[in-house]
Each structure stands twice: as structure tokens, then as C-alpha cells.
């Protein structure tokens, strides 16, 4: 497995053709009085071919700094950053690992790549509007993310059930 910064030489519109964005969710976290409470709320997340093509076009748009995990020239994970700082934070816009490749350290490796990118760009934290599924929040928490004390209002409004999380990556001067 190799983590690479995406460019036109290693990524095309067809690069996500076989990507499996599938997740069966049973439990989600909800905020209640400032605390995360786990509640039963089953749903399934699944990308069809149209959604995968749209994601590939987003990656190729030039609006994001994107790292992908490649296994035998196939994309098995992606993480997209909005390159402009927001109050000293870089925002993770998208972060997924293909279903069959989860629990292999790929997400951790992708996150480390964007931590290094954030440091190069002078950020002190990473910010993410996270799907509230138990698995997703447990992963982000294990990676050092905590509920943001300064959530970005547009993300809260657009995704009211997402949890706004951030991870400090260096000490402020």
C-alpha cells in the first residue's frame, strides 16, 4: 500500500470505479447537553457508480489537496483537504477507506499524510464534520480528535447530525 498526493498522473475519472463506499450503521452518536450519547439509528451508506464518478471529479477539480492510498494501482482510500486555513485549521472535506481494506491501518496512514500537509501549510489543527456513526466517531476519537470548541456554523447548518471534531497537531506559539 502506498499513500500518494493525487495528481493527473496517478488519478483519473475512472480511479474510483471499483471503490466500495459501503457501511451498515447501527448506532450513531447524538449530542445531548454537550455530551455524546449513543443511540440506535440504523441506515446504510452506499455509493453507486454516479456517486463514485462525482467524487473522482471533485478530486480532479483542483479545489482540494487529496491523498489516496493505492494498492496495486487501485485506489483503496482517499482523504481530501480544503487548502485554505479556517482559524488556523485545515478542513477534511472527505475521508473514506474502501470496505474490504478497512482495519488495516490505511485510514491512520492517510490521516498522518494530511497531518504532515497541515503542518507544512502552517495549520495548528485538523477539522472534520464527521458522520455520527459509532464506527466513524470511534475512529476519529482514537486518532486524537475531540469535539470542536469552535464549530464552523455552515457545517453545523448543512449537516446537523454530524459531529464537529478537531485534532490539535502542534502547539500554538
Task: Give short role names for the model-derived ranges.
Residues 1-4:
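Extreme N-terminal starter segment of soluble prokaryotic enzymes
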Residues 7-12, 18-89, 93, 98-99, ...:
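Acetyl-CoA-dependent GNAT
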Residues 87-89, 125, 162:
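A generic structural signal for beta-strand entry/edge sites
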Residues 97, 103-116, 141-142:
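Conserved acetyl-CoA-binding loop-helix of GNAT-fold acetyltransferases
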Residues 121, 142-143:
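Structural motif
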Residues 136:
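Helix-turn-helix
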Amino acid at each position: 500500500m502506498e499513500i500518494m498526493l493525487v495528481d493527473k498522473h496517478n488519478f483519473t475519472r475512472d480511479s474510483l470505479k471499483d471503490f466500495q463506499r459501503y457501511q451498515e450503521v447501527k448506532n450513531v452518536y447524538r449530542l445531548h447537553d454537550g455530551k455524546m450519547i449513543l443511540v440506535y439509528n440504523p441506515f446504510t451508506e452506499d455509493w453507486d457508480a454516479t456517486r463514485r464518478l462525482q467524487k473522482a471529479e471533485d478530486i480532479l477539480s483542483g479545489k482540494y489537496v487529496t491523498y489516496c492510498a493505492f494498492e496495486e494501482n487501485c485506489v483503496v482510500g482517499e482523504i481530501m483537504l480544503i487548502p485554505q486555513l479556517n482559524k488556523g485549521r485545515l478542513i477534511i472535506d472527505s475521508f473514506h477507506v474502501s470496505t474490504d481494506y478497512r482495519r488495516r491501518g490505511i485510514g491512520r496512514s492517510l490521516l498522518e499524510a494530511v497531518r504532515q500537509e497541515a503542518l507544512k501549510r502552517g495549520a495548528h489543527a485538523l477539522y472534520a464534520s464527521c458522520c455520527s456513526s459509532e464506527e466513524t466517531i470511534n475512529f476519529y476519537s482514537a486518532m486524537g480528535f475531540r469535539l470542536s470548541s469552535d464549530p464552523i456554523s455552515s457545517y453545523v447548518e448543512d449537516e446537523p447530525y454530524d459531529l464537529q471534531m478537531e485534532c490539535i497537531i502542534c502547539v500554538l506559539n
